Each structure stands twice: as C-alpha cells, then as structure tokens.
C-alpha cells in the first residue's frame, strides 16, 4: 500500500477505483497510511473521505470546499471534545443514530467494537437531559470502564 500511495499515478488510480467501487476497506487502508499519500493526490483522498462520511478522519480540511466544510461541522458534537479540545466529530453512521435518538426514536444497535457506541452513550449523558439512563454492557470490565468514563458528568 505504501508503494502505491507514494506514486502519483498509482495513487490516483487507487482513488478512482475506491470511488467507483465504493470500497470502504481500501479507503480505511489509505487513512491508516496517510503519511505515505502523494502530496498532489491528498485533496482527492480528502474528498473521498468526506464523501464516505468518515468525518473524524479528515486530515486536510483546508482543501475541502464550502459544502464539505459545512457537512463536517454538522457532524460535530455539541457536548464532547476531541484530543485537541475542539468539538469531537461523529462519522456518518454515528450522526445518523444520534439524530434518531435525539428525535426520541427507540433503537437497537449492533455494531463492531470500533464503531463508537460508547461515544454515543457519552454524548447523551453529557447532555444532562435525562435524570435516569440505563446502560446495559456485556462484561463487568466494560461496565467499570463506562462508569469511570461517565463519572465526570456526575453532579
């Protein structure tokens, strides 16, 4: 992958294939190897990252157009901060679930460990809109981790 990303023509061809095939796995691989992406193709990959809804992974927001910047801002949390103390950005699926729950729609969510379900739980606890929230976790370790993480919202 590194070899492909460092070569302009190969990198551009990869971006084209990702776009045509809607290949999320390949795009994730590009994100993981961002430091190797040819400088002149980075804006193309930034557009792809944005179009796939991977907003938290946008590295070079200055190359995005106004509409893309607006979509990126729309996916930001009002309550949670990221490591640089800016507002945390949800990816497309997280924002979709956040909106459903905000509109009082009941959901059952099954997603991989890395999806960010715990982040959504933290978002709703941080809002302090509810006095009682029930959180069901599959293991004692995860229950304890969640309890420690949410303790900062205790009044």
Where are these regions (language model features)?
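N-terminal helicase ATP-binding lobe
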Residues: 1-155
């Amino acid at each position: 992958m590194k070899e492909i990303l460092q070569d302009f023509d190969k990198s551009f061809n990869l971006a084209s294939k990702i776009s045509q095939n809607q290949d999320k796995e390949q795009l994730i691989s590009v994100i993981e190897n961002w430091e190797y992406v040819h400088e002149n193709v980075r804006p193309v990959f930034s557009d792809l990252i944005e179009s796939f809804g991977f907003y938290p992974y946008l590295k070079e927001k200055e190359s995005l157009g106004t509409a893309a910047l607006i979509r990126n801002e729309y996916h930001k949390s009002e309550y949670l901060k990221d490591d640089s103390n800016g507002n945390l950005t949800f990816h497309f699926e997280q924002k979709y679930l956040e909106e459903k729950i905000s509109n009082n729609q009941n959901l059952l969510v099954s997603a991989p460990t890395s999806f960010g379900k715990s982040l959504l739980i933290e978002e709703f606890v941080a809002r302090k809109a509810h006095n009682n929230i029930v959180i069901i976790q599959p293991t004692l370790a995860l229950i304890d981790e969640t309890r420690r993480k949410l303790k900062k919202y205790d009044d």
